[in-house]
């Protein structure tokens, strides 16, 4: 029989570790900051270990705390999954997938109904993000990411290639005779700061510092280009409609190889719902 586990203390610790703040943990748990701090002290006394360094601007986990947090994140995630599977009085497999917004809008959402019709017992919960995810902390089964597939601690399977290329309006393209002419235009950037540098290097152009606005969405960049001009370095495959309509053109053929990837934690066993979704999306891609 298990010894008495300090469940309230573990819950307070997990929330504090996730937020790195007793105050934000207290707001989440609907208790006082003092109550959270006391529960963490109880856990520290129980383990005979210091779990947090109390700093002026927040908390910092010790090595012991990081090890405990990893275990609790997984355990609480599994408990939450089981509860969600029985919501509504019937059993359903819950599958939580995060996707970059451009992929979600441009590829996944138009196909979601096909998945639901084929697999009605799988409740797909879709989140969007800007490609920065923490699968364990966010309780994700899969994340669909854009890049080169070199992410640690995850199994990464390419869905399809989506090379980065320059898109602009036909009016802007008339001013572009060679790649270096782009340096006279407003170059919109993603948070991946080296993309334009890599593109110009592939074009044989030495670029000065690029200071265009930074976006966390390729789709938002493209909408900005259409309405205000400039040029964006984006996966053209996701903007076939705008290209076909003549709203956008590709002034140059130079590309940076990238792709969309289905990723999941190597440490997370595949559930039946995960296997179903993986087989479906790979086939559809």
Curated annotation (Swiss-Prot):
Keywords per UniProt: Activator, Cytoplasm, DNA-binding, Transcription, Transcription regulation
Family: Belongs to the LysR transcriptional regulatory family.
Chain residues forming the annotated DNA-binding region: 22-41
Protein's GO biological process: DNA-templated transcription
GO cellular component: cytoplasm
Species annotation: Citrobacter koseri (Citrobacter diversus)
A Pfam family that the UniProt record links to this protein: HTH_1
Protein localization: Cytoplasm
GO molecular function term, any single one: DNA-binding transcription factor activity
Domain of life the protein comes from: Bacteria
Protein purpose: This protein is a positive regulator of gene expression of beta-lactamase (AmpC).
UniProt xrefs under SUPFAM superfamilies: Periplasmic binding protein-like II, Winged helix' DNA-binding domain
Protein name from the UniProt record: HTH-type transcriptional activator AmpR
Domain HTH lysR-type: 5-62
């Amino acid at each position: 029989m298990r010894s008495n586990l300090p469940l309230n203390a573990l819950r307070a610790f997990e929330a504090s570790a996730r937020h790195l703040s007793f105050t934000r943990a207290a707001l989440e748990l609907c208790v006082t900051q003092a109550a959270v701090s006391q529960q963490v002290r109880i856990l520290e006394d129980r383990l005979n270990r210091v779990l947090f360094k109390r700093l002026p601007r927040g908390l910092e986990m010790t090595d012991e705390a990081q090890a405990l947090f990893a275990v609790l994140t997984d355990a609480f995630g599994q408990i939450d999954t089981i509860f969600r599977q029985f919501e509504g009085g019937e059993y359903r497999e819950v599958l939580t997938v995060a996707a970059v917004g451009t992929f979600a809008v441009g590829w996944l959402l138009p196909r979601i109904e096909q998945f639901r019709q084929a697999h009605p017992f799988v409740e797909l919960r879709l989140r969007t993000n800007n490609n920065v995810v923490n699968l364990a902390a966010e309780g994700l089964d899969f994340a669909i990411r854009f890049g080169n597939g070199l992410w640690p601690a995850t199994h990464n399977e390419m869905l399809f290639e989506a090379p980065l290329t320059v898109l602009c309006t036909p009016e802007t393209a008339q001013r572009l005779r060679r790649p270096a002419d782009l340096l006279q235009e407003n170059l919109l950037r993603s948070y991946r700061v080296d993309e334009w540098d890599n593109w110009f290097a592939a074009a044989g152009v030495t670029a000065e510092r690029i200071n265009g606005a930074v976006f966390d969405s390729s789709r938002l960049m493209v909408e900005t280009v259409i309405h205000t001009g400039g040029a964006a370095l984006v996966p053209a495959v996701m903007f076939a409609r705008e290209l076909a309509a003549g709203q956008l053109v590709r002034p140059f053929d130079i590309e940076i190889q990238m792709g969309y990837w289905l990723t999941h934690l190597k440490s997370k066993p595949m559930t039946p719902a995960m296997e179903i979704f993986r087989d479906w999306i790979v086939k559809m891609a």
